[in-house]
Amino acid sequence: MELSSPSKKTTTSPINIPGGNRDNLIIGPHSHSFKTDPFSSNNSSLLSKISTNPSLESPFSSKSLLDCSPVQAVKKSLESEAKTHSLDEETNEQTDVKILNIADFPTDELILMISALLNRIITANDETTDVSQQVSDETEDELLTPILAFYGKNVPEIAVVQYLERIQKYCPTTNDIFLSLLVYFDRISKNYGHSSERNGCAKQLFVMDSGNIHRLLITGVTICTKFLSDFFYSNSRYAKVGGISLQELNHLELQFLILCDFKLLVSVEEMQKYANLLYKFWNDQ
C-alpha cells in the first residue's frame, strides 16, 4: 500500500481564549476610516479588563533594531542619515561564535529579552514621531499604505511582554519564530528607509512605535509560523489571541508581506547573528 507524505495542516484547539471574541478586540479596532482601509470597525476594546500599563524605559532610535548602545541618548530628530547604519555593520569578528543556543534557550526568557529591546525602540520612537500627523498628512502616499494598515484608533495598553506571553500561551511556538521577527522588522526598516519630504528633510517611512507594534507582532508570528514551522494554527485563532478580527488579520498578512518584499527566508547564520546580538544587548543593559 502506498503511503502519502503528510502535508502541513492548520490546527485548532478547543481551549478557551479570554478577551478575543468577535465583538471585543484586545488591541482595539483599526484606525482608518479613509479609503485605504476596507476593514474599519466600531468594536469596543477589552484593554481595561486584561492589561496593565507598560513600563517603558531607555532609548533606542528608529534606525536598525540593534544599532545603538543601551545608554545612548534619544535623538531629537531622524535627519542624521549619515550616522544611520544597519545591524550588519554592528557585527564583529566574533559574530559566528554561538552565544545564545537557539534550540535550547528558554522561550520565556527569550520573550523577556525581545520585549526589552522592542520597548526601547518604541519608547524612543514615540518621543520622536507623531503618528496622528503621519496618518492625516500621508494617506495618499502609496508607499505608506501597508505601513498605516498596522495602526489602530487608540494605543493599546497591554505591554509588549504581556502580549508576547499571551501569544506564546495560546499559540505556542519556538525560539526561531520570535528571532525571525527581529530579522523581518530590520528588513522592513531597511526597505522603507528615508524618503524626502516637501521641505527637503529626510523622513523614516517605517517606524515601530506603540501604535503599531502589537499588530506587527501578531501578524509577524502568524506569517513566520506558517513559513518556518510544520505546526501552526488557523488564522481565526491567531486573530482571537491577538485581539483583532479575522478579516483584519487576513488583510495585515498581505501588507506585512509587501513590507518584507515577500522575502521570508532566514538563514541559520543570520538568525544566530541576531540571537547573539540580542543576548549581548540583554547583558549590557
Swiss-Prot record:
Misc remark: Present with 3390 molecules/cell in log phase SD medium.
Gene Ontology biological process terms in this record: cell division; glycogen metabolic process; regulation of glycogen biosynthetic process; regulation of glycogen catabolic process; regulation of protein stability
UniProt key word Ribonucleoprotein: no
Activity regulation (record text): The PCL7-PHO85 cyclin-CDK is inhibited by PHO81 in low-phosphate conditions.
Chief location category: cytoplasm
Keyword list, A-Z: Carbohydrate metabolism, Cell cycle, Cell division, Cyclin, Cytoplasm, Glycogen metabolism, Phosphoprotein
Region named Disordered: 1-42
Low complexity bias: start-end ranges: 1-14
Origin species: Saccharomyces cerevisiae (strain ATCC 204508 / S288c) (Baker's yeast)
Induction of expression: Cell cycle regulated, with a peak in mid to late S phase.
Entry similarity comment: Belongs to the cyclin family. PHO80 subfamily.
Modified residues (Phosphoserine): S69
Gene name of this polypeptide: PCL7
Location relative to the cell: Cytoplasm
Subunit structure: Forms a cyclin-CDK complex with PHO85. Interacts with the substrate proteins MMR1 and YJL084C. Interacts with the CDK inhibitor (CKI) PHO81.
Gene Ontology annotations for the cellular component aspect, listed alphabetically: cyclin-dependent protein kinase holoenzyme complex; cytoplasm; nucleus
GO terms for MF: cyclin-dependent protein serine/threonine kinase regulator activity; protein kinase binding
Protein name stated in the entry: PHO85 cyclin-7
Main function: Cyclin partner of the cyclin-dependent kinase (CDK) PHO85. Together with cyclin PCL6, controls glycogen phosphorylase and glycogen synthase activities in response to nutrient availablility. The PCL7-PHO85 cyclin-CDK holoenzyme has GLC8 kinase activity and phosphorylates and inactivates the phosphatase PP1-2 inhibitor GLC8, causing activation of PP1-2, which then dephosphorylates and activates glycogen phosphorylase. PCL7-PHO85 also phosphorylates MMR1 and YJL084C.
